């Protein structure tokens, strides 16, 4: 999607689909800093999709060109949420004041980015996800991780949590659904 967007804007793309095809791969283990210092000579921006949470943030600290986070492991996926916000804006003609319900696995990076994005608007959001199940020992806790909830509170996001969509769906203006699965971000 990032490549297609650049071509639609009249730009060109130089890239690689796998870090193993670069000096950051298995043999050399080049650092993010060294990789970015090399990449910044190839273009005017870097779109980084990385398996490591926080890698684009680290890359931005070293780069002399803008770094766009195209998804980072279990961390964030802001470009996806920007696309979702744009779709809502096209369909609803506004974002402020809409009541959001986010359903699924809150460990997913898009849910984290949704929370951060909604801090910029007057939008209450309810995160709906299952907690650990006593009937199935070892089942994952899919609720929003504490580190993100702390950030959302610090940024004054109006949010709450629920375990069942039936509790909140009647009040929703926008529903964002993520699968309840174990993604492989490697």
Label for each model-derived stretch:
Residues 2-89:
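Phosphate/diphosphate ligand-binding glycine-rich loop within oxidoreductases
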């Amino acid at each position: 999607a990032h490549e297609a967007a650049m071509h639609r804007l009249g730009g060109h793309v130089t890239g690689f689909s796998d870090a193993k095809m670069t000096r950051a791969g298995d043999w050399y283990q080049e650092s993010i800093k060294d990789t970015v210092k090399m990449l910044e000579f190839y273009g005017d921006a870097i779109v980084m999709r990385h398996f490591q949470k926080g890698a684009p943030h680290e890359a931005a600290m070293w780069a002399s060109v803008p770094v766009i986070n195209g998804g980072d492991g279990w961390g964030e996926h802001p470009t996806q949420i920007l696309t979702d916000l744009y779709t809502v804006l096209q369909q609803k003609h506004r974002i402020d004041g809409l009541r959001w319900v986010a359903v699924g696995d809150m460990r997913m990076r898009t849910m984290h980015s949704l929370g951060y994005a909604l801090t910029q608007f007057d939008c209450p959001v309810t995160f709906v996800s299952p907690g650990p199940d006593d009937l199935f020992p070892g089942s994952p806790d899919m609720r929003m991780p504490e580190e993100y909830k702390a950030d959302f509170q610090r940024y004054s996001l109006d949010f709450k949590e629920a375990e069942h969509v039936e509790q909140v769906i009647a009040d929703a203006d926008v529903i964002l659904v993520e699968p309840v699965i174990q993604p492989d971000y490697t």
